[in-house]
């Protein structure tokens, strides 16, 4: 077992500066934008409904139960709103706190296993990784479950590598259970026990040794299951007690269909990707930490010959996680995000060794210059009007021509930040130049680009227009709707389910219109209803995310017309965005 040097005031100051930088990078833009598709609006809508209805046990999406994910993230978003009273802040707050917590855990574990400096470098490696910045600036479940898996691995490592410390082991099992009720894959933290058992059996060094403690190991099972039971027991009890098809279907869907079918690639359309799929992800999405991969091979080989149990457990766990997701038919880049923190801890000795390497400094400086020139060139090309295809795509997404210029000016500013950092730091501090440029990029994205793209990415303007069209006494029902429509609406809206076929929604909505044809309106996606609607009697509410939205009353509906059912590909696309 390793005994790391005690931290000094200078080490703690370095951590404080790192967390301040992380707060700027991850927090820049919080409060300046609304939830963006595809997942952010649905989670924020569920959280908002929890607060308004008082029902926190069964999440709802409009009038129907939402069975796709356990409600852990939505609970935290709703709780955040109770504190800050601003949904633009509350929906992103759990991701921000999860990011800061992940960095502290990486720093502390690497500090204890290697040295305070190694801990700082490992945390910097995590913060600077492209996937970390991209994901932890969004309100997705993945940042939260990554924090929980990291906390579980941290607690297990405190026992397996720095112990014995049974309370840490039990805590790790408990947090892994919390990860399961956040997103089913939280269980992967417990895979750390397998390389530990193999390395201990082989007599490797740096591992906790216990004897006659089988009952203590066994207590990890109730700790794990107990965390799951905190949510599962009340949910199952209430659902079975109510016994309605809606609640029984919710229970079946969330317990069996979602996790198993997603792993098998039958939900979300992320199937058909080869075994090699995660290779480029680990290289590109974990950049710039991936610059250390080549040098880490030498350290891993040295650790193997030295029978270093620390590397065996950490790298063994990473390999098992990678194998787990590689074997799955359904694959997405973000699935390997939970690997990043422990991979950085395992690479900490390598980062410490190559920190001042000339090749790394020169490479980092060259990359900073390349990124800067690339962003400036992109902005200049777009602003010159010569890149017609790019402008066409952005206009299709609802961005007005007068909005493109400030967005690309911010892109140019991000490129200039890379170049300025390279000019100031030069080759002697090339790594600093690259890190500073990446930090500036995320800050510019948060405070410059995202707020200006917000109106086109969200349905805020469309829903305000729909509200004006209906008038103060009008009522609106949604057909073929998206979560952001209900979330951004300034008035209550009616729906006939989200997962129901648009044809069924439309049929029921038309019957509802007939009850008060002068007062009631249908708000619908154009492509979903145009076969049965006379466009001459339609009022266009607007366009967002390349979708046009219509408002119409009963006089626009073609008599005896029935909408066709969606094709499977169309249904998968609708479910995924």
Q: Can you describe what each PLM-predicted range is?
A:
Residues 24-29, 42-65, 72, 79, ...:
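Extracytosolic helix-loop segments that constitute the early lumenal/periplasmic catalytic or substrate-binding loops
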Residues 46-48, 174, 187-332, 342, ...:
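Transmembrane-lumen/periplasm boundary regions of multi-pass, lipid-linked membrane glycan transferases
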Residues 1-26, 216-224:
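Start-transfer (signal-anchor) and selected internal transmembrane alpha helices
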Residues 93-113, 151:
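Transmembrane-helix motifs of polytopic, lipid-linked glycan transferases
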Residues 112-113, 117, 152-169, 179, ...:
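Membrane-interface transmembrane helices that cradle and orient dolichyl/undecaprenyl
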């Amino acid at each position: 077992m390793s005994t790391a040097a005690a931290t000094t005031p200078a080490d703690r100051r370095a951590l404080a500066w790192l967390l301040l930088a992380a707060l700027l990078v991850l927090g820049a833009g919080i409060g300046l934008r609304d939830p963006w598709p595809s997942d952010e609006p649905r989670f924020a809508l569920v959280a908002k409904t929890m607060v308004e209805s008082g029902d926190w046990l069964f999440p709802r999406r409009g009038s129907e139960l939402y069975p796709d994910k356990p409600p852990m993230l939505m609970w935290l978003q709703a709780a955040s709103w109770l504190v800050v009273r601003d949904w633009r802040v509350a929906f992103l707050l759990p991701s921000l706190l999860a990011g800061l917590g992940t960095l502290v855990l990486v720093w502390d574990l690497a500090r204890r296993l290697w040295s305070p400096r190694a801990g700082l470098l490992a945390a910097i490696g995590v913060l600077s990784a492209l996937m970390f910045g991209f994901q932890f600036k969004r309100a997705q479940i993945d940042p939260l479950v990554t924090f929980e898996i990291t906390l579980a691995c941290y607690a297990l490592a405190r026992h397996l590598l720095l112990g014995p410390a049974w309370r840490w082991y039990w805590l790790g099992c408990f947090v892994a259970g919390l990860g399961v009720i956040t997103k089913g894959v939280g269980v992967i933290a417990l895979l750390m026990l397998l390389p530990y058992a193999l390395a201990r059996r082989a007599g490797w060094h740096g591992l906790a040794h216990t004897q006659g403690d089988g009952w203590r190991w066994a207590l990890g099972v109730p700790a794990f299951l107990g965390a799951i039971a905190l949510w599962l027991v009340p949910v199952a009890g209430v659902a079975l007690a109510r016994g309605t098809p809606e609640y029984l279907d919710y229970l079946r869907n969330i317990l069996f269909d979602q996790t198993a079918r997603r792993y098998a690639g039958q939900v979300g359309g992320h199937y058909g990707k080869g075994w090699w799929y995660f290779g480029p992800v680990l290289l590109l999405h974990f950049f710039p930490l991936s610059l250390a991969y080549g040098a880490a091979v030498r350290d891993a080989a040295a650790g193997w010959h030295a029978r270093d149990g620390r590397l065996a457990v950490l790298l063994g766990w990473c390999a098992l996680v990678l194998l787990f997701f590689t074997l799955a038919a359904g694959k997405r880049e973000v699935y390997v995000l939970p690997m990043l923190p422990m991979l950085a801890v395992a690479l900490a000795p390598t980062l410490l060794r190559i920190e001042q390497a000339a090749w790394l400094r020169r490479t980092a400086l060259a990359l900073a210059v390349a990124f800067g020139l690339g962003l400036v060139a992109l902005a200049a090309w777009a602003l010159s009007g010569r890149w017609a295809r790019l402008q066409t795509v952005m206009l299709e997404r609802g961005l007005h021509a007068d909005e493109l210029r400030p967005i690309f000016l911010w892109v140019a500013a991000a490129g200039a930040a890379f170049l300025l950092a390279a000019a100031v730091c030069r080759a002697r501090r090339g790594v600093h130049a690259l890190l500073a440029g990446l930090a500036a990029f995320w800050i510019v994205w948060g405070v410059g680009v995202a707020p200006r793209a917000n109106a086109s990415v969200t349905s805020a303007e469309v829903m305000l227009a729909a509200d004006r069209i209906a008038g103060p006494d009008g009522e609106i029902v949604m057909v073929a709707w998206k979560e952001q429509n209900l979330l951004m609406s300034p008035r209550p809206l009616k729906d006939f389910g989200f997962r129901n076929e648009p044809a069924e929604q439309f049929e029921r909505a038309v019957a509802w219109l007939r009850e008060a044809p002068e007062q009631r309106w249908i708000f619908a996606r154009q492509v979903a209803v145009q076969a049965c609607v006379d466009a001459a009697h339609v009022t266009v509410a607007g366009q967002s995310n390349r979708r046009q939205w219509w408002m119409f009353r009963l006089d626009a509906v073609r008599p005896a017309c029935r909408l066709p059912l969606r094709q499977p590909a169309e249904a998968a696309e609708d479910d995924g965005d």
